[in-house]
């Protein structure tokens, strides 16, 4: 697999479109950090790391509106790919849907949202947009 982050986002997208409640994805440290950000920002209901084998899996419980069964995540867009990396400085931090969404940035201080990176005045690789 050449792009595990794109695979992770695609698994989430497919589970959302199929209206699944829980999706299992192969674990990695970067995927754990992205999942933690999605949980902290309220895009997913819950997550759990399960150690089964050398790598383990992450069980992600998706968040749906109780009235009209709409998911909290409208779009997941992969920005930086292995073939074309996208970097940004803290002055040029992307605004996703005029501040309503988040960009997940991989920085020297770890994985964080665009707002957190701008507050710390550090740039990094733009992994994906979530809204």
From Swiss-Prot:
One of its GO terms (molecular function) is structural constituent of ribosome. One of its GO terms (biological process) is translation. GO terms for cellular component: ribonucleoprotein complex; ribosome. PANTHER family: 40S RIBOSOMAL PROTEIN S15A. Part of the 30S ribosomal subunit. Contacts proteins S5 and S12. One of the primary rRNA binding proteins, it binds directly to 16S rRNA central domain where it helps coordinate assembly of the platform of the 30S subunit. The gene is rpsH. This is Small ribosomal subunit protein uS8. Keywords: Ribonucleoprotein, Ribosomal protein, RNA-binding, rRNA-binding. The keyword Cytoplasm does not apply. Belongs to the universal ribosomal protein uS8 family.
């Amino acid at each position: 697999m050449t792009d595990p982050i794109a695979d992770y986002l695609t698994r989430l997208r497919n589970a959302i479109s199929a209206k699944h409640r829980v999706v299992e994805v192969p674990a990695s440290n970067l995927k754990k950090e992205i999942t933690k950000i999605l949980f902290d920002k309220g895009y997913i209901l819950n997550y759990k790391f399960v150690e089964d084998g050398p790598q383990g899996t992450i069980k992600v419980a998706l968040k749906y509106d109780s009235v009209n069964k709409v998911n909290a995540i409208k779009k997941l867009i992969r920005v930086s790919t292995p073939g074309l990396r996208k970097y940004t400085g803290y002055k040029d931090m992307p605004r996703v849907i005029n501040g309503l969404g988040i960009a997940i940035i991989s920085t020297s201080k770890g994985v964080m949202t665009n707002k957190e990176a701008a507050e710390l005045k550090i740039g990094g690789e733009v992994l994906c947009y979530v809204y």
